[in-house]
Curated annotation (Swiss-Prot):
<dbReference type="GO" id="GO:0042026">
    <property type="term" value="P:protein refolding"/>
</dbReference>
<comment type="function">
    <text>Participates actively in the response to hyperosmotic and heat shock by preventing the aggregation of stress-denatured proteins and by disaggregating proteins, also in an autonomous, DnaK-independent fashion. Unfolded proteins bind initially to DnaJ; upon interaction with the DnaJ-bound protein, DnaK hydrolyzes its bound ATP, resulting in the formation of a stable complex. GrpE releases ADP from DnaK; ATP binding to DnaK triggers the release of the substrate protein, thus completing the reaction cycle.</text>
</comment>
<dbReference type="GO" id="GO:0031072">
    <property type="term" value="F:heat shock protein binding"/>
</dbReference>
<keyword id="KW-0862">Zinc</keyword>
<feature type="binding site">
    <location>
        <position position="189"/>
    </location>
    <ligand>
        <name>Zn(2+) 2</name>
    </ligand>
</feature>
<feature type="binding site">
    <location>
        <position position="167"/>
    </location>
    <ligand>
        <name>Zn(2+) 2</name>
    </ligand>
</feature>
<dbReference type="InterPro" id="IPR008971">
    <property type="entry name" value="HSP40/DnaJ_pept-bd"/>
</dbReference>
<dbReference type="Pfam" id="PF00684">
    <property type="entry name" value="DnaJ_CXXCXGXG"/>
</dbReference>
<dbReference type="GO" id="GO:0009408">
    <property type="term" value="P:response to heat"/>
</dbReference>
<keyword id="KW-0677">Repeat</keyword>
<comment type="subunit">
    <text>Homodimer.</text>
</comment>
<dbReference type="Pfam" id="PF00226">
    <property type="entry name" value="DnaJ"/>
</dbReference>
<dbReference type="InterPro" id="IPR001305">
    <property type="entry name" value="HSP_DnaJ_Cys-rich_dom"/>
</dbReference>
<dbReference type="InterPro" id="IPR001623">
    <property type="entry name" value="DnaJ_domain"/>
</dbReference>
<dbReference type="GO" id="GO:0051085">
    <property type="term" value="P:chaperone cofactor-dependent protein refolding"/>
</dbReference>
<feature type="repeat" description="CXXCXGXG motif">
    <location>
        <begin position="150"/>
        <end position="157"/>
    </location>
</feature>
<dbReference type="GO" id="GO:0005737">
    <property type="term" value="C:cytoplasm"/>
</dbReference>
Length: 381
C-alpha cells in the first residue's frame, strides 16, 4: 500500500515552516489521539500517519531527503528502526544487534527522532468534599499548578527569530554509541540531552524549556453521588506536551470529609439515634435527620439498644445511576444523668417494684445470670 504525501497528511504547503508544521500536527494529533478514539482502528492509523509525517518534516536532514527523493529517501528512518553502520561497517551486523539490546537497557531502544512529539504528563488533584456536596453534586473552583506551552516561543525553546542547530556531538540523533570491546552501548547524548539539537539563543521567557509554569483556576462539575476514590477526568488539562505533543489530562480525585452525624457506606448512610429508656420501654416517635430534612421515626415498645431501623430511599443515589440507598438508624439507649434526689428515689421505687416479679421484665439479664450460675455449677467437682 503506497504512502500518502507527508505534506498532504498534515494539510500544509511544501514550503511550510516549522511553526506551521507544529500547528498542523497539534490539531490533527488531538483529533486522532487514541485516548479520544478508543477502539477506533481508523483513528489509530491516522494518528500513526500524522506522527510519522511530523517526525520526518521536523528533522532537517530527513525533510531534505524526502523533498529530493520522496518516501524512498526516508524509508527505514521514520518511525524507529535502529539504523546506522554495523559491525565492520556493514548494515545489520553484530554491532546493531547488541546495540539494540543494550540500548533498551541503557535508555535507548533504537534510534528515533529526538524531536518526536511527546504527550504531556497526567496530573492528579485531591479534592476534599463535604458529604452534602458529594451527594447532591456541585461545582467547585480549583487552582492547579502545571506547565503550559510557552506563548513567547510557541513551545520551541528558542528565542523567536533565532534557529536551532544540529547537535555537533550526536549529529541530530539524540544518542551516541560507545564501543566497549565487542559490544556497542547506546547512551543519551551528553551535549543536547537527547534533543538532537542545541539552542543558540534560548527563549527569554522559558529559558529554552519550551514550557512555563502557571497556576490556573479551573471550574470542575462534581456529579451527584460521587464517593471517595472516584476520579473525574479533565481532558487536556494536564502538563503541556513536548515538541508539539498533546497535553496530558487532569484527574480530580474525590475524598469525602468525615460528617458529624452520618457515616457513608457506598450508597447507604448510617447514623446513631439516642433514645431514653422511657421511649425505649413504652415506645414513641422521634425526629431523625436525613440529608433531605427531618423525618419521623416510630419506635415500638420494648425497643432494645442497638436495634437498627431502615429508612428506605434516604441514602445516596449512585453516581453511575440506580436507585438511592437507605438510611440505617441505630438506636442507642442513653442513661439519664444529673438526676435529683427525688428522681433517684422514684427510680429506686420502680426498681423495687420489679424485684421479685417475673423474669420476663428483663429476659436478657435473667438469661445471662442463669448462664453464669450454670457455668459455676458445672465447675464444681
Amino acid at each position: 500500500m503506497s504512502k500518502r504525501d507527508y505534506y498532504e497528511v498534515l494539510g500544509i504547503e511544501r514550503g511550510a515552516d516549522q511553526k506551521e508544521i507544529k500547528k498542523a500536527y497539534r490539531r490533527l494529533a488531538q483529533k486522532y489521539h487514541p485516548d479520544r478514539n478508543p477502539d477506533d482502528d481508523t483513528a489509530a492509523e491516522k494518528f500513526r500517519e500524522v506522527s510519522e509525517a511530523y517526525e520526518v518534516l521536523t528533522d532537517e536532514e530527513k525533510r531534505s531527503a524526502y523533498d529530493q527523493f520522496g518516501h524512498a529517501g526516508v524509508d527505514g528512518q521514520a518511525g524507529g528502526g535502529f539504523g546506522g553502520g554495523g559491525f565492520g561497517g556493514g548494515a545489520g551486523g553484530f554491532s546493531d544487534i547488541f546495540g539494540d539490546v543494550f540500548g533498551d537497557i541503557f535508555g535507548g531502544g533504537g534510534r528515533r527522532n529526538p524531536n518526536a512529539p511527546q504527550r504531556g504528563s497526567d496530573l492528579r488533584y485531591n479534592l476534599e468534599l463535604d458529604l452534602e456536596d458529594a451527594v447532591a453534586g456541585t461545582t467547585v473552583d480549583i487552582r492547579v499548578p502545571r506547565h503550559i506551552e510557552c506563548e513567547h516561543c510557541d513551545g520551541d525553546g528558542a528565542e523567536p527569530g533565532s534557529t536551532k542547530e544540529t547537535c555537533p556531538t550526536c549529529h541530530g540523533q539524540g544518542q551516541v554509541r560507545m564501543q566497549q570491546g565487542f559490544f556497542a552501548v547506546q547512551q543519551t547524548c551528553p551535549t543536547c540531552h537527547g534533543a538532537g539539537q542545541t539552542i543558540k539563543v534560548p527563549c527569554r521567557k522559558c529559558h529554552g524549556e519550551g514550557r512555563v509554569r502557571e497556576t490556573r483556576t479551573l471550574s470542575v462539575k462534581i456529579p451527584a453521588g460521587v464517593d471517595t476514590g472516584d476520579r473525574i477526568r479533565l481532558n487536556n488539562e494536564g502538563e503541556a506536551g513536548l515538541n508539539g505533543g498533546p497535553p496530558g489530562d487532569l484527574y480530580v480525585q474525590a475524598a469525602i470529609k468525615p460528617h458529624p452525624i452520618f457515616e457513608r457506606d457506598g450508597r447507604h448512610l448510617q447514623c446513631e439515634v439516642p433514645i431514653n429508656f422511657i421511649d425505649a420501654t413504652l415506645g414513641g416517635e422521634l425526629e431523625v435527620p436525613t440529608l433531605d430534612g427531618r423525618v419521623k421515626l416510630k419506635i415500638p415498645p420494648e425497643t432494645q439498644t442497638g436495634k437498627m431501623f431502615r429508612l428506605k430511599g434516604k441514602g445516596v443515589k449512585p453516581v453511575r445511576g440506580g436507585p438511592p440507598g437507605d438510611l440505617l438508624c441505630k438506636v442507642v439507649l442513653e442513661t439519664p444523668v444529673n438526676l435529683s434526689d427525688e428522681q433517684k428515689d422514684l427510680l429506686r421505687q420502680f426498681q423495687d417494684s420489679l424485684d421479685g416479679s417475673n423474669s420476663h421484665h428483663s429476659p436478657k439479664k435473667t438469661s445471662f445470670f442463669d448462664g453464669v450460675k450454670k457455668f459455676f455449677e458445672d465447675m464444681k467437682p
